[in-house]
Regions:
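A short helix-loop-beta-strand connector motif used in the catalytic cores of GNAT acetyltransferases and
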Residues: 33-45, 73
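Conserved beta-strand in the GNAT
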Residues: 43-45, 51-60, 78
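A short beta-loop-alpha structural element at the N-terminal edge
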Residues: 1-8
Length: 141
């Protein structure tokens, strides 16, 4: 199922420190159902021959400023190593941007934990500017 494939994709290519506790797949499936039922969340996946090879998670957040226009946050952009540089993640980022536009968002916000120039260039090539704002992160236990 998509849940098992997403878990594998995340843990192999995205998460530097996979969870030490066993992940309940029914919880994963339920969360994915909740995402699909929520008009402000999109969990986008790209499949090739029935295999999930890329994914992007986008959430629209309501806002009290900028004429009450919401903004969107993109997280968990990941592509299987064997399927990179084939346009899959770019297509999903475009779909995420269209989703944000459909909600009248004034911006799409994306952070990456990577400092690799190739990763930053990938985002720049997909319309995301770097160096315009400063991001602050507080990790919680």
């Amino acid at each position: 199922s998509d849940a098992e494939q997403l878990k594998k994709l995340y843990f192999e290519y995205l998460t530097a420190f996979p969870p030490t506790e066993e992940q309940n797949m029914e919880t994963w499936r339920e969360m994915i159902r909740e995402f699909y039922d929520n008009e402000f969340i999109k969990l986008l996946v790209c499949e090739v021959d029935g295999i999930v090879v890329s994914t992007v998670h986008v959430t629209v957040i309501k806002n009290l400023t900028l004429n009450l226009r919401p903004y969107a946050v993109i997280e968990n952009v990941v592509t299987h190593g064997s399927y990179r540089c084939m346009g899959y993640a770019s297509a999903l980022l475009e779909e995420a941007t269209l989703f944000a536009k459909s909600h009248n968002c004034y911006k799409v916000f994306l952070e990456t934990g990577s400092n690799k120039e190739s990763t930053l260039n990938f985002y720049r090539n997909n319309g995301f500017a770097t160096g315009l704002k400063h991001s602050c992160l507080k990790k919680l236990p």
